Amino acid sequence: MNLKILVGLFILGIIILSAMTFLNFTTIVAQDKGDQQPKGPIVYTYTEYNGTYFPHILTVVYYPCNATCSNLGFPSVWPVSNENQCHNAVVNTTCQALIEGVDWQLPLLNYVGGVAIPLSTPPCKLPWAQQLGVKGALVYYTQMVGEPLGVTLACGLLYATEDSMPGSITAINPVTGKIVWMANGLAGPAMNNPVVWHGIVYVSVGGVCFTFSQFVHFEDHQYCKIHRGRCGAVYAFNATNGQLLWMRFTYGEAMPAPAIYDGILAYVTGGGCFVGVNATTGQTLWVDHFPGFIANMASVNYYVLPNGTPLFIAGFTYTAPPYGYIIAVNGLNGHEAWNATMPAPYVGANTGLGDVAPAVDQQLGIVVDNDIANFSNGYVDMVTFALNATNGKPLWAVNTGRGPIPPAYKGGMPLIVGNVVYDGNPSLGTVNAICIKTGKILWSTKLPCLQTPPKFPGGPRGSPTYYHGLLWVSAGQYVYVINPKNGDILTFYWIGGRLGIMNPVIAGNTMFLSNSYGWIVAIPLSQIYPAYIYY
């Protein structure tokens, strides 16, 4: 009888071990490694999903002791890049510490296999600065190592990505700056703003590189065969503990952030794919193919038609004239609703409409975007334009100024507040206010101490943030505070490093910033501009 029990226990043990192996799931209790890593972290490792193996071991480390026990009052949804359709990244909070303002700096890159460079380091000391020059080194570190875009606040956590290879996503306690969980070993650089939907956080990955065969296609005028990045992927993680829920590989990179509406996750790729999936399960709902169209950094947005049908909207680069399109697809079936190019008389150039994520005014039914045009002798116009969100017809286009072509991300992400569009011109280092109904420039302000092309990358690229009656703008090494009524600069505050395509994210009296040098920074607004409370 005892022998039968022993045999039964042995067989049961084999079954349990087999199940754990099948799920590729491991739980490990690690040693104490300091303040950021308390005793007892839980480690999940994944080598495949649904029978398809990963290129890297995906390791998720969860530190439950670092999570906050209180309800911060954050939303459970962050559906698009920069929090909402208008790109105003302001989050309500009930947390007294955030309302009063917290102050911390986290060298995030150090925890995911990179090197967080001190924020006071001059650009000439960056990797490859001697070989590429200061401008090239700043762009390289943003594209290949640090955090290009801003952070996400949802479900009581702050989420940030790193595009150092392999890519990573990290969940951080926004009050203390301690890591709650991190997933390292993604199938490519994570270069965008994570989106969140009711307990699930999503990140898409992919690099900036082209294979040599793409240049052959270009030389042979085979533009429809060109795609960027051999492969990418989309991941869904449990927002609380980081467990992998599902993933799928993509044809071409998946650099831009996806968008979510009513349980549908829509993403685009460098292989000309526009894809809709079930946000909970990852199952395919529809797939569109646009041969030769390349998704760069223009994250997906959406507009809801009066009948309730969502349109997912994204920008694509094309390597021949007109160099870019904005495409809207029906979110229920994937059918193309409309496509648009830059309105005449402007002619798109270079990366075209694939860089800048469009903003959407749901109430007015307007899509706003920004791009370079009329390239000649190294100079371009920086054009902001508006389209009818229902049919894509042009409403207006305005030139915010001509200057040297900026490197890499060639535009300024627009913000819509009321009847005004605020966006940047990285070529000239200006912020512009534009009437959304007419396209009239209301004011234009040059940002002081911001180094611009042709010697430097310039800015601002990320959208401004409107809060407490003020505009908060990040560019170069500074955060600028601007009066939105007349464009007057009230103050500017040194952060250091490089504030690239990112936007300030605000909760209470606290601003959260990502930095290309590999840092996440929390700082009280009252430290940046004490008088803000009077606005």
Curated annotation (Swiss-Prot):
Inducing factors: Expressed in tetrathionate-grown cells.
Subcellular location: Cell surface
SUPFAM superfamilies xrefs: Quinoprotein alcohol dehydrogenase-like
Gene3D superfamilies associated with the record: 2.40.128.630, YVTN repeat-like/Quinoprotein amine dehydrogenase (2.130.10.10)
Source organism of the structure: Acidianus ambivalens (Desulfurolobus ambivalens)
GO cellular component: cell surface
Record-given protein name: Tetrathionate hydrolase
Temperature dependence: Optimum temperature is 95 degrees Celsius.
